[in-house]
Amino acid sequence: MALKKKPVTGMKDILPKEMEIRNYVMNMIRETYGSFGFSSIETPCVEHIENLSSKQGGENEKLIFKILKRGEKLKLDTAECEADLVDSGLRYDLTVPLSRYYSNNSGQLPAPFKALQMGNVWRADRPQRGRFRQFMQCDIDILGESTYLAEIELVMATTTLLGKLDFHNFTIRINDR
């Protein structure tokens, strides 16, 4: 069987020049958000399927790359539904893993906790032009602070970062879902 040279649809190889730019940006992100007191954390790329799935189904359900159970847990002959076959999936964003992380580790973290995450995420939907199934995401959150000051700090830290990256004349829109 011949080796397929191109990556799977929606994935891409990253060449050295792009990696150099990416590393520069990631270092600037760590440095800038670190100066605002954000701590870098890392969560696994694989999460329990129950954490990734919402009870209502919906759009997020379609984003999950699901992972089959392995070994003795995988019983193909008696499976009646998808839940009998799948127990985990690749994260489609960094928010769900952060919720699990904070729930598991909050007793060992300062309050409020300022989290910085950068990592690959995967989306199982069919990618549109210019979009990918695997991509790097950056996320900052302040947990345990109920005032609007946390929201203001997120905006200030991000505008500082964008300025350091030489972005100008940008607009920040605030959404409340």
Predicted stretch roles:
Residues 1-177:
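TRNA-recognition modules of translation machinery and tRNA-sensing kinases, especially anticodon-binding
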